[in-house]
Amino acid sequence: MSVVINEKRRSLLQAASSVGLLMGSGLASEAIAATTKQDPWKQAQAIIDRFAKPIHFRKEDFLVTSYGAKTCDVKPVEAWVSFVERKTLQTPVADATDCYPAIAAAIAACHAAGGGRVVIPAGNWYVAGPIVLLSNVNVHLNAGAHVYFSNNPADYAKYGKYDCGKNGKLSMTRWEGNDCLNFSSMVYAYGQRNIALTGDDWTAILDGQAGVNFADSPYCWWSWKGREKPSSVGDIAPGSGDWIKHQKGETEVSLNPLNPVSLAEVAPHLSEEKRLFIQGEGDKWRRDSNYLRALAEAGIAADKRVFGLGHFLRPHMVQFINCSNVLFQGYQVTNTPFWQHNPVGCRNVHVKNIYANSVGPNSDGFDPESCNYVLIEDSTFDTGDDCIAVDAGKGPDVQYGPSQNIVVQNCKMHSGHGAMTFGSIMSAGIQNVFAQNLVFENSHWKTDPLNIAIRFKCNMSRGGFLKNLHIRNISIPNGIRTTPAFYATLPGSVIPTKSVATSAGAVITIDCGYDPLSDNVRTRPPVVSDIHISNVNVGNVDTGAGQFSSYQAIVVLGPVPSDYNGPASPAPKIVPVKNVTISDCDLGNPVNKENPMYLFNVKDLVLKNVRVGGTVYNKTLSV
């Protein structure tokens, strides 16, 4: 049973039936197992206090110029700066010195000496390969240092640890929650400790050049997204009918003929029934983005999941895997091929005063994945996807455990899909996360509005849990997107297509049926509980049709039982979203005045002093 809360039909609320109790997860961390009764914000302060003492590095600088690095001249180039906008940027001239060898040598020398700073001075620098950090090294950009990374994919398949023949020399990476051998990220580290990426200020720039066309090609890194012409409101700037084109067959969502015609070729251990279950109907599973998921579901080892050259999975800008004592501070990243930052399985990660500035496709700002003890503060995000998304692996790839003990504070978000997001890549679970004192500016609300302010997303494929999440003191002066967007539902779903605006339009969205058509294997029901949100204040903007803050105020789509496609016996328990509290909030004036909220499969949603339009809610809802 679902309910859209309609002020003309309040009787629906009294008639809403209660549902079964939510089971706890068996993956709770020792750090928080006994803390449910104490003030959760004391837990947050304890996490913050862990970072009071900075990471120590030896007091020795290694200038990259001492190892042969030379600045380069730049020339103007017309390039994409978003999916629908081009501008004149700068790019290195054709004969620019490649500083990759010099930077790699400086890092090696610094590491061998016991650590210190590898310094990139002011100027323009061309780097045709990844900057790979080693333990006890701080790579530091002086003010005015602009590092232009090569936009040639082959340069990120030249130096990796794994020689994969025609696919290149690849690195162990993680792509949307699944491990694989692929292009290195532009800044990379694996298994290191005491490392830092720092700058003097936001004029210290790491530039991925993702919107600059490949040599002798009309396509760029962002073309690999394979996105068709957008049609929804806010996707195309006024007066523009242009968007990034792509070569047919050369995208992450194209059927790749290099991928086998049957999983039997790479996973002969699978029964035919299991193989067909993972593949699903047709050949869509042979698209690179789907093929990686299929390999993971089939139990193929990570070092046998080979992509790189001939494939189209874009690299991250910064990806550190299985590292500890990590600092990101005082620089800007821009024009990134894929996610801007993705620490995976890292411990003690401090993010301070960075500018994540890339609005291309999938340009998430900062995505800590299966990380323990993270502080993100005093930073600004302008993104083409989620500003911050807390993740925790996908499907079987949960070896790094949950994301937990994370604080986000004193940050500003301009545009993106979700300002503060949890999931959907969360198979290992997300718990004990605190977000406070944030401004979701939505400064581009006329042309590129923020889709959702506070977003929780999961589904029957990713599973996992969301619990003990606390959010307070959020200012959203320019509202969010005021038109709805939807995900297609599965055939036979109890949720009619285009009936629940979980893709865009609600200030607070808990979506347990996220994009269900994208996954063939849907056997892991998510568990969502103990979410507490307070003091969220949303402004209205003049849309021409009136003063509005959003399309709806709150959407809670609990797990949809009909999405499950696993065995009937034994079947996992599918339980409602439980114990969500929203208090002391003014969510503005939603466009959908008749139905300002939507609820499905939720137990104990507590509203305390929550103003929506002209109504103040004080009630507990179970639907």
Segments from the language model and where they lie:
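Short glycine/acidic-rich loop motifs that flank beta-strands on beta-rich extracellular proteins
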Residues: 115, 127-130, 150-152, 209-212, ...
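Right-handed parallel beta-helix
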Residues: 143-144, 193-204, 324-334, 347-358, ...
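Beta-rich accessory regions
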Residues: 460, 465, 472-485, 489-506, ...
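Alpha-helix capping and helix-loop boundary segments enriched in small/acidic/polar residues
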Residues: 93-97, 342, 363, 367, ...
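Extracellular "leader-to-stem" segments immediately downstream of a signal peptide or signal-anchor
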Residues: 2-130, 134-138, 142-321, 338, ...
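Asp-box/BNR beta-propeller blade signature and adjacent active/binding-site loops
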Residues: 66, 80, 100, 104, ...
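Short, recurring structural edge motifs at helix starts
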Residues: 125, 363-365, 395-398, 421-424, ...
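Short, T/G/N/S-enriched strand-turn elements that build extracellular solenoid repeat scaffolds
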Residues: 107-109, 127-134, 339-345, 378, ...
